[in-house]
Curated annotation (Swiss-Prot):
This is Bifunctional protein GlmU. One of its GO terms (cellular component) is membrane. Inhibited by its reaction product N-acetylglucosamine-1-phosphate and by UDP-N-acetylmuramic acid, which is one of the first precursors specific for the peptidoglycan pathway. Its cofactor is Mg(2+); Co(2+). UDP-N-acetyl-alpha-D-glucosamine binds at residues 11-14, 25, 76, 81-82, 103-105, 140, 154, 169, 227, 333, 351, 366, 377. It catalyses: alpha-D-glucosamine 1-phosphate + acetyl-CoA = N-acetyl-alpha-D-glucosamine 1-phosphate + CoA + H(+); N-acetyl-alpha-D-glucosamine 1-phosphate + UTP + H(+) = UDP-N-acetyl-alpha-D-glucosamine + diphosphate. Acetyl-CoA binds at A380, N386, Y387, S405, A423, R440. It comes from Escherichia coli (strain K12). Residues 251-456 are annotated as: N-acetyltransferase. Changing C324A: 8-fold decrease in acetyltransferase activity. Changing K25A: 8-fold decrease in uridyltransferase activity. In the N-terminal section; belongs to the N-acetylglucosamine-1-phosphate uridyltransferase family. In the C-terminal section; belongs to the transferase hexapeptide repeat family.
Length: 456
């Protein structure tokens, strides 16, 4: 079906009192992303011409957190109901576009459901998203005559008979811009709450003989709102369960789907295995046959084929070629790069450093601002001293170098191909190819030495 141009209004002005937080409710995160950002992303994916964000409390924090050029910020200085919120945005509506109304605290609404609602909207009428609940207490009820939607009655204003209705309003609707502006202008606050309800436009449309079509979401979780942290945690588990199910069906082996968190997007090859309590953040790519041990965090990184990441390793903004092994307890910070077959062992940290093909840093090492060649051995306790308190400097190590344990490389420094650095050496000058560098304090020995004894 050919759709009209469309703009989206997202209501995000609520205080979120029940969150007991200084952060605006809609900025609390689900799957690593602010709830309202999920809704903004859905609006953009639908092709919204404009996204009008109605805000009130915490406006400065919202503007700091949400960097989207497509956002039009609309202030609702007083919170006088959903209808009042829409009235603030109405001056921005074009007559010939459709207006879709969404909520910043309903984060799991799907693009597929919204597109079905958009397609179902009748010409000159309203598309309304509704669901049926076993216990609809507290929700606005959908009233019908001969099967046709005639209005929405809020729970506090409903009669005992109307409260028996199980079909409820989700608050999500779509209508033409000109119609929306006209109906909004007619709203009154003659109700138990003394507020302007957006739901009253349904009765106004019905009185004009306009058709109102109700559409149901694919899943109830799509229209569940968040008012407290318990509800947010439940939606988090719903979302994570759905993501885990998709990955399992796509061939990823999750050892325990209930103990896996995806906080971004995961692209993967075949026969990937992920153990328990692994967190994937941002954009992550895993090649074929990648294995990730328990407790790992992988963020914005590319992991090549046949890599193995041992437990409790953190990888952020890093790039691993094929057949690399990392961990346990390793940390790859932004700019870390491992070439094919490289190994980083336990308690090794890398930042802005490249480790060449087949090179190894087995344990207890810091490699920062370093370029390390192929087939290099980095001994335990090696440190690249890259910072003088004001500036960073680079360490370059050629191919086939052997670096002994407890070595300090004071940058800027270059170690030539095939060189050997003796254990305990502090390297302050360049080392030539195939040379041995050694710097040690002469060892002295005192025979018959007795340790001091504490006086009682």
């Amino acid at each position: 079906m050919l759709n009209n141009a469309m703009s989206v209004v997202i209501l995000a002005a609520g205080k979120g009192t029940r969150m007991y937080s200084d952060l605006p409710k809609v900025l609390h995160t689900l799957a690593g992303k602010a709830m309202v950002q999920h809704v903004i992303d859905a609006a953009n994916e639908l092709g919204a011409a404009h996204v009008h964000l109605v805000y009130g409390h915490g406006g400065d924090l919202l503007k700091q957190a949400l960097k989207d050029d497509n956002l039009n910020w609309v202030l609702q200085a007083e919170q006088l109901g959903t209808g009042h919120a829409m009235q603030q945005a109405a001056p921005f509506f074009a007559d010939d576009e459709d207006i879709l109304m969404l909520y910043g605290d309903v984060p799991l609404i799907s693009v597929e459901t919204l597109q079905r609602l958009r397609d179902a909207k009748p010409q000159g009428g309203i598309g309304l998203l509704t669901v049926k609940l076993d216990d609809p207490t507290g929700y606005g009820r959908i009233t019908r005559e001969n099967g046709k939607v005639t209005g929405i009655v809020e729970h506090k204003d409903a009669t005992d008979e109307q409260r028996q209705i199980q079909e409820i309003n989700t608050g999500i609707l779509i209508a033409n811009g000109a119609d929306m502006k006209r109906w909004l202008a007619k709203l009154t606050n003659n109700n138990a709450q003394g507020e302007y309800y957006i739901t009253d436009i349904i009765a106004l449309a019905y009185q004009e003989g306009r058709e109102i079509v109700a559409v149901h979401p694919q899943r109830l979780s799509e229209v569940e709102g968040v008012n407290n942290r318990l509800q947010l945690s439940r939606l988090e588990r719903v979302y994570q369960s759905e993501q885990a199910e998709k990955l399992l069906l796509a061939g990823v082996m999750l050892r325990d789907p209930a103990r896996f968190d995806l906080r971004g997007t995961l692209t993967h090859g075949r026969d990937v295995e992920i153990d328990t309590n692994v967190i994937i953040e941002g954009n992550v790519t895993l090649g074929h046959r990648v294995k990730i041990g328990t407790g790992c965090v992988i963020k914005n990184s590319v992991i090549g084929d046949d890599c193995e990441i041992s437990p409790y390793t953190v990888v952020e903004d890093a790039n691993l070629a094929a057949a690399c092994t990392i961990g346990p307890f390793a940390r790859l910070r932004p700019g870390a790069e491992l070439l094919e077959g490289a190994h980083v062992g336990n308690f090794v940290e890398m930042k802005k450093a490249r480790l060449g093909k087949g090179s190894k840093a087995g344990h207890l090492t810091y490699l920062g601002d370093a370029e390390i060649g192929d087939n290099v051995n980095i001994g335990a306790g090696t440190i690249t001293c890259n910072y003088d308190g004001a500036n960073k400097f680079k360490t370059i190590i050629g191919d086939d170098v052997f670096v002994g344990s407890d070595t300090q490389l004071v940058a800027p420094v270059t170690v030539g191909k095939g060189a050997t650095i003796a254990a305990g050496t502090t390297v302050t000058r360049n080392v030539g190819e195939n040379a041995l560098a050694i710097s040690r304090v002469p060892q002295t020995q005192k025979e018959g030495w007795r340790r001091p004894v504490k006086k009682k």
